[in-house]
Regions:
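Short, hydrophobic/aliphatic alpha-helical segments
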Residues: 45-58, 112-129, 216-237, 363-367, ...
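N-terminal flexible segment immediately upstream of the FAD-binding catalytic core
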Residues: 1-54, 64-95, 124, 172, ...
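N-terminal glycine-rich flavin-associated loop
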Residues: 3, 21, 27-59, 77-125, ...
């Protein structure tokens, strides 16, 4: 009743068919929401969250193409952002972009392409995944690593807390507003900040987040930022919707590197492949994608592109798909020289060739991008694939 009064009948649905349609996601879980809200208004979301809090009902947000372990499910109030909240606004000549949570990676990058820019995060499901999920999961992808992920490229954010409080971190008065509206939250954030900055804890947090890590909350925010609103906005990244709703975000973009050098490095064992990583990283490689023997065999079985995967020298082989992204031909030539120097010292099945030919590198990336579907497709009828990021 509160939701209907606040939002109106056109935005709130109790229809069993609508609720059943959004009940499943790509996980093995099934929860049917009690109410479905579809709106493109931050104030509507704030009203919905405040009403849910008054009635002690859970609220969840549905985006697309993100985590696959039931994060998009609820038996309470579901707010579906995929039909609305799709705004994209280019700022500062493409160096920044304001995005809403219903916009997909592909849609944003297609707008940024004319400026020679793109978003830092590049998850494989970029056609379907929306910025709401990318930010809430701290998605990275194949080339951004820890340097250009969602956390590192966030400039500012508008978020809605469970109480209905709306904070815009681009507003110079945001710290005062947060302190006025949420004094207990601010006190808690400051206490946690001080605890995290104790030497032993700070050293552990620094170590954990010096590598790719999306487990739990981003506690590095307590070390990287000093004020409550900035800390909270960066805790939102990777929080999977548990801290609030991300209504929009301004993201710093990265330059598109037009000169590429790609190679598939084939190793006799998985151990040999992993031992090669430090030298490759030191050489400045942008992308390193590992494929084990099972993955390689599935790729070999592909009727279109399987021929590009070399035959297995025995059981347990592995491969690294590596790629250098460079701003010009000179730096590309230098990268290829560095790559050849490293690979000449590696335990490889055959000598690799670095290429920028789309006819060669395209099929390799097609196989890699479609690898999850191939692996999941081998399961028996009635089985469900369970997967989640563990790093």
């Amino acid at each position: 009743t509160d939701l209907l009064a606040a939002l109106g009948e056109t935005k709130v649905s109790h229809d069993p068919l609508n609720l059943a349609a959004v009940a499943p996601d790509a996980s093995h879980y099934l929860l049917t929401p009690g109410v479905l809200v579809r709106t493109g208004s931050t104030s509507d979301v704030a009203a919905a969250m405040a009403a849910a809090k008054r009635h002690n009902v859970a609220v969840n947000f549905r985006s697309g193409g993100t985590s696959l372990s039931g994060q998009g499910l609820t038996n309470g109030v579901m707010v579906d952002t995929r039909r609305s909240f799709r705004g994209i606004e280019v700022l500062d000549g493409g160096r920044k972009v304001r995005v809403q949570p219903g916009a997909t990676i592909v849609a944003v990058n297609s707008v940024l392409a004319r400026y020679g820019r793109k978003l830092g995060p590049d998850p494989a499901s970029s056609v379907a995944c929306t910025l709401g999920g990318v930010l809430a999961d701290n998605s990275s992808g194949m080339s951004c690593g820890t340097v250009a992920n969602s956390y590192r490229t966030l400039d500012s954010m508008i978020f809605v807390l469970a109480s209905g409080t709306v904070i815009d971190t681009a507003d110079p008065q945001c710290e005062d507003k947060l302190a006025h509206d949420e004094p207990e939250l601010v006190e808690t954030l400051m206490a946690l900040r001080d605890q995290c900055r104790e030497q032993a804890r700070a050293d552990e947090i620094t170590f954990q987040f010096s590598r790719k890590n999306t487990m739990g909350y981003g506690l590095n925010a307590f070390l990287d930022y000093d004020t409550p609103a900035q800390i909270l906005s960066h805790l939102m990244i990777g929080s999977e919707g548990t801290l609030g709703f991300i209504s929009s975000a301004v993201m710093n973009t990265v330059k598109i590197m037009p000169n590429l050098a790609t190679a598939l490095l084939h190793f006799p064992t998985l151990d040999a492949a992993t031992k090669a990583l430090p030298a490759l990283v030191k050489s400045g490689v942008t992308v390193t994608e590992l494929m084990d023997s099972s993955s390689l065999q599935l790729c070999r079985d592909d009727p279109v592109n399987g021929h590009i995967i070399p035959p297995a020298p025995g059981s347990g082989d592995a491969a690294l798909l590596v790629e250098y992204h460079c701003p010009d031909r000179k730096s590309r030539n230098e990268a290829v020289a560095a790559g050849n120097s490293v690979t000449s010292e590696l335990d490889l099945v055959n000598k690799p060739t670095f290429t920028d030919d789309p006819a060669v590198r395209g099929p390799i990336w097609t196989l890699r991008s479609g690898l999850y579907a191939k692996v999941a497709g081998t399961r028996q009828s009635g089985q469900t694939a369970l997967l989640e990021d563990i790093a």
